[in-house]
A protein has these predicted regions:
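A generic fold-level signal
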Residues: 16, 111-112, 142, 175
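Sparse, context-dependent recognition of short Cys/His-centered cofactor- or disulfide-binding micro-motifs
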Residues: 6-8, 15, 79-83, 88-91, ...
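PAS-family sensory domains
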Residues: 19-87, 145-188
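PAS-family sensory/regulatory modules and their coupling/dimerization elements
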Residues: 64-121, 188
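Sensory modules in modular signal-transduction proteins
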Residues: 3-30, 132-152
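Short coil/turn motifs at helix boundaries and re-entrant loops, enriched in small/polar
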Residues: 1, 13, 18, 101, ...
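Generic "edge-of-domain/loop-turn" microfeature
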Residues: 28, 103, 113, 125, ...
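Sensory coupling linkers of modular signal transduction proteins
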Residues: 1-4, 111-137
Length: 188
């Protein structure tokens, strides 16, 4: 397998994994990308990427389009982080809500020669779950009586703030993962 076959295999593997993959040269010009990257980029930037496209210019051009929804401050920060990542040779990771209800995880890693590898992963399902779990936790905490949830193995999953606070008054510390037997024995 020669080098170009290896690159194609890598691009295909990332496509099969549902991730976008792009390679940028040391001057931040796009050298290669997979199909998923093209789809994600086109959806967010409102134009298709092409080999030779400059990263900063792409954002400047996209910002002129009224459909472009990414925050200009986030864009400046991302460009600065990419430059710092090139200097530090450390990956940077961020999550962005690219449109209402759609989230991307972006990981960018610099090579030793200054190239930047960008991996885009759609994390909308996970972010939606996290948001719903947070709302549920807030709702449970708002209930004006003790609420404790136990799993099938009688381990504490969640206790609302009132239950935690009032049990502490009796020196009973509620901890996620504690058994129901521990809870009962700590009361007496």
């Amino acid at each position: 397998m020669d080098n170009s076959d290896a690159i194609l295999a890598m691009m295909d593997a990332f496509d099969n994994g549902g991730q976008g993959l792009a390679v940028w040269d040391p001057k931040d010009n796009l050298t290669s990308f997979n199909i998923n990257y093209k789809k994600i980029f086109s959806s967010n930037m409102h134009f298709s990427p092409e080999v030779g496209l400059n990263f900063g210019k792409a954002y400047a051009d996209a910002a002129k389009n009224p459909k472009f929804t990414l925050d200009p401050e986030n864009t400046k920060q991302r460009i600065a982080q990419r430059e710092q990542a090139r200097l530090d040779k450390r990956p940077i990771e961020s999550e962005y809500e690219v449109e209402p209800g759609k989230w991307l995880h972006v990981k960018e890693t610099a090579s030793n020669d200054g190239h930047m590898i960008t991996v885009l992963t759609d994390v909308t399902a996970r972010k939606t779950r996290e948001i719903m779990q947070s709302k549920l936790a807030d709702a449970i905490d708002a209930i004006p009586s003790h609420v404790m949830f136990w799993d099938e193995k009688e381990k504490l999953i969640k206790a609302n703030k009132l239950a935690v606070k009032e049990n502490l008054e009796y020196e009973v510390e509620l901890r996620e993962g504690m058994s129901y037997a521990e809870f009962l024995s700590s009361q007496f």
